[in-house]
Amino acid sequence: MNPSPLLDLIDSPQDLRRLDKKQLPRLAGELRTFLLESVGQTGGHFASNLGAVELTIALHYVYDTPEDKLVWDVGHQSYPHKILTGRKNQMHTMRQYGGLAGFPKRCESEYDAFGVGHSSTSIGAALGMAAADKLLGSDRRSVAIIGDGAMTAGQAFEALNCAGDMDVDLLVVLNDNEMSISPNVGALPKYLASNVVRDMHGLLSTVKAQTGKVLDKIPGAMEFAQKVEHKIKTLAEEAEHAKQSLSLFENFGFRYTGPVDGHNVENLVDVLKDLRSRKGPQLLHVITKKGNGYKLAENDPVKYHAVANLPKESAAQMPSEKEPKPAAKPTYTQVFGKWLCDRAAADSRLVAITPAMREGSGLVEFEQRFPDRYFDVGIAEQHAVTFAGGLACEGMKPVVAIYSTFLQRAYDQLVHDIALQNLPVLFAVDRAGIVGADGPTHAGLYDLSFLRCVPNMIVAAPSDENECRLLLSTCYQADAPAAVRYPRGTGTGAPVSDGMETVEIGKGIIRREGEKTAFIAFGSMVAPALAVAEKLNATVADMRFVKPIDEELIVRLARSHDRIVTLEENAEQGGAGGAVLEVLAKHGICKPVLLLGVADTVTGHGDPKKLLDDLGLSAEAVERRVRAWLSDRDAAN
């Protein structure tokens, strides 16, 4: 680690406030260097944090945290906040099992005012805190820090609309770096970008009036000044929109300040001190650069949004001399991306929709090959789903590529706008199940439960990569709303067909014949079920579909076996195991059933294999649980 004499003095914001304001730029440099080194070792969100260093220092320098509340939106940019609030020596554990969470977490620190992981929640949460303080007679201040990408979500504007009508002391800091994870899309980011240059017409008139007479007396000066004036007028035409930023937020009832350089920490301190003394809703528009201070991240903030590990800058810029690695087995996301392009090449009706997750959802190639049929709607999951419904009404075949955890945000639209109207929209539900380092806010553990109760829905869960392609093709051709949910990362390594074969909807398949015990497995749990079944001589059914579920297969297995074990990487409550129990009850079958899924708990973060073992869903844990269950039953009999 590089020496950091100022940063080493800081264990809390109280220590930070003892520094002279002129020392803060140096502190920012030390903090940024520390970030480069710590994230380089552990991995994690990177470019967003580099861009928020000065802003974080200034906020903690001015505001009396933890008494005053800082509410970070999404949390990608919260690492400097964690470093300054007593967690610097734990940063090497970031996103690791038993270590620091990658996002603000209330149970981790009193400085983490609100837990977060999804976008656009900060203004509403900070507004609630400000309203509570008013009712309690407290003079605490609440601050929401939100990126311009998160401002594309309707929830942010719902909160702005509400806040402007309430007499509360609230500061919203708009951290404008023209990025979310991918480049921002939509009218609002363009609107904000047009307002970075301030209105210069008044300034130009003043300069001309004051200096015109002097310039007339200097040979050649007037001609030069006229050229400068032309350049300024060109900028001024764009800057006419600057007044609109003020108008936009002031029409919501906020007093607008900005844009302000988000990397000038001393000026930020002065501005924030002024804003802290003001009453009522305030909005500070700060301009930052994602990846600031690390050229590779500045030049490619999408690639460096999050990193597994960080090469030295000099090494990263050199051509690799290593032998190319053999091609790894494809991830489920890559299987989906290839299927989508193959299907689109054969069907001009196919359109793809993503809520600001082009890279993560595997849509980069699709956008390049079919730009007219690609729609990135921004961080707007609700709109994405209803938009897909409108496309389906006119004969298009929409495919919504979305993470399981983000589909939760559009549940009403899925029910009201898609399912009740039986519109043929396919949801490619990525990151189903445990996701690892991102933790509980990003885990996809509830989709089977909340999808299978929705009328008209088809819900499928592939057990390997080829099954993923089969089920995508099958559900795409269904004249009904459908969801195919698949996990993060790679699968079993099954060879993937290039064809568009389909399977019968609502029918499972026996993967292994055994005796006495039947494993009824869904999706990613088929592989561990097969591993355990080899040791216990059990039958394994790959159900493929959670809805419609294969009642005939379940009844046949129940009548030909002594006991049943269901396995799913989803919440036990309301999940696929519950669907099996419903079938047994419907047919009056009473057999011992062991449900294996995620218990009613908040999961942790870290290595997915370790998390699955803790949840009792790794192959080793499944074997232990099943053997213990069988032993208990034998003892009882």
From Swiss-Prot:
Annotated residues for binding of Mg(2+): D148, N177
Keywords: Isoprene biosynthesis, Magnesium, Metal-binding, Thiamine biosynthesis, Thiamine pyrophosphate, Transferase
InterPro entries registered for this protein in UniProt: Dxylulose-5-P_synthase, THDP-binding, Transketo_C/PFOR_II, Transketolase-like_Pyr-bd, Transketolase_BS, Transketolase_C, Transketolase_CS
Binding site for thiamine diphosphate: H76, G117, H118, S119, G149, A150, N177, Y294, E381
Annotated cofactor note: Binds 1 Mg(2+) ion per subunit. Binds 1 thiamine pyrophosphate per subunit.
Gene Ontology CC terms: cytosol
Assembly behavior: Homodimer.
Family note: Belongs to the transketolase family. DXPS subfamily.
Name assigned to this protein: 1-deoxy-D-xylulose-5-phosphate synthase
Originating organism: Neisseria meningitidis serogroup B (strain ATCC BAA-335 / MC58)
Lineage start: Bacteria, Pseudomonadati, Pseudomonadota, Betaproteobacteria, Neisseriales
Gene this protein is translated from: dxs
